[in-house]
Amino acid sequence: MIICNVSRRSVSASPRFKETERPRPPMNATADCQTTTVDPHRPRYAVYAMPAGEFADAGAAWLGWDARAGRQVAQPHLPGLPRPLSQLALRAGRYGFHATIKAPMALAGDCGYDDLRDQLRDLCGRLHPVEVTLELRDDLNFLAFRPAGGTGDLQDLAATVVRDLDPLRAELTEREITRRNPGALTPRQQGLLVQFGYPYALEEFNLHVTLTEQLADDERRIVRGVAEDFFAAKVPAPWRIDELCILAADAQGRFHLRDCCPLKG
């Protein structure tokens, strides 16, 4: 139960959004990587599904940041890459190796971290673990692990978390809305941005474990081949998501693990 005091906001789409003639396709993985400055007076928290074991270790090495341990990791020199990993995964590395369930947010009213943790812990006690078969994809101009098959259970889990935690979320500032480039979103995505602070929620949700920035076609093909070799035999089949984790952004915008809540339903 939410115990902090928050004022409820309207969930209707804002009239300031103007639809472009041809909205661009969803780029939800890169949308997580658009923060350029961090306001120390508005701590940001996110709820992630985080890989474990050698898959997580490989991902931390690729990105150069271990969000579980809260430390930088030496990125390997991988022959064949067109650029160093430090450039290919520059912004993605801030967030760690993860799949977003509830996008980074500030907390509303007098809500504090304990309220978020307790609410997620209670929620996870009622949610079931889910299994996802992953494949390496590059069809949205960046490289990411994404589901290879049906995701109905995963969609339900993510939607439940987004809805149940949203009363804790502070309303987006004008600057945050502008950063999302709402003119490039579909009308439905604009509505979700206003309602949940993120345009790729509910039916627009698409799980992704991001590896790179957006890349040109020729680079993307090369990097994909190198990544396939690097992650070979390290990707769980399937990936069992049996806990959800809260991460907090530091003053540099890097995310650190705070708590993990097991799915016990």
Locations of regions flagged by a protein language model:
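Small/polar glycine-rich anion-binding or flexible loop at a beta-alpha turn
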Residues: 240-248
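Basic, often amphipathic N-terminal segments
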Residues: 28-139, 152, 156-238, 251-265
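Low-acidity, Ser/Thr- and Arg-rich intrinsically disordered low-complexity segments
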Residues: 4-16, 22-24
